[in-house]
UniProtKB/Swiss-Prot annotation:
GO biological process, alphabetically ordered: translation
Chain ranges passing through the membrane: none
Keyword ATP-binding: no
PROSITE patterns referenced in this protein's UniProt entry, alphabetically: RIBOSOMAL_L21
RNA-binding found in the keyword field: yes
Organism: Opitutus terrae (strain DSM 11246 / JCM 15787 / PB90-1)
InterPro entries assigned to the protein according to its UniProt record, in alphabetical order: bL21-like, bL21-like_sf, Ribosomal_bL21, Ribosomal_bL21_CS
Family to which the UniProt record says this protein belongs: Belongs to the bacterial ribosomal protein bL21 family.
Gene Ontology CC: cytoplasm; ribonucleoprotein complex; ribosome
Keywords on record: Ribonucleoprotein, Ribosomal protein, RNA-binding, rRNA-binding
Molecular-function GO terms, alphabetical: rRNA binding; structural constituent of ribosome
Name used for this protein in its record: Large ribosomal subunit protein bL21
Oligomeric and partner information: Part of the 50S ribosomal subunit. Contacts protein L20.
Length: 104
């Protein structure tokens, strides 16, 4: 069974056993279980159901495999002939999760 979920400001279509990289869940450790209640749609074929905007009672549970930081993104700004240069870096905090079950 597939489900479309919304978590950490992003939408994903997942099935059981999928591994995703999402924005980090606050105050969680690796090995913790997260329940995602914002399920937008579930099913395949004739069993497909769409929520308005979410399905009541549908829950997707996921296990956090690890918390890590993403690749460094360099933001460089320059204005020609003005002598202005600015270089900043950013690394996004990420969580790697594995979808364990989809309950409708």
């Amino acid at each position: 069974m597939k489900a479309t979920i919304k978590t950490q400001g992003q939408q994903f279509t997942v099935s059981e056993g999928d591994i995703l990289t999402v924005n980090r869940y606050p105050n969680t450790e690796a090995g913790a279980t997260v329940e995602i209640s914002e399920v937008l749609a579930t099913g395949e074929g004739e069993n497909f159901r769409v929520g308005t905007p979410t399905l009541a009672g549908a829950i997707v549970s996921a296990k956090i495999l690890e918390n890590k930081r993403g690749e460094k993104v360099i933001v460089f700004k320059k204005r020609k002939r003005k002598g202005m240069e600015r270089k900043r870096g950013h690394r996004q905090e990420l969580s790697v999760i594995k979808i364990e079950s989809i309950k409708v």
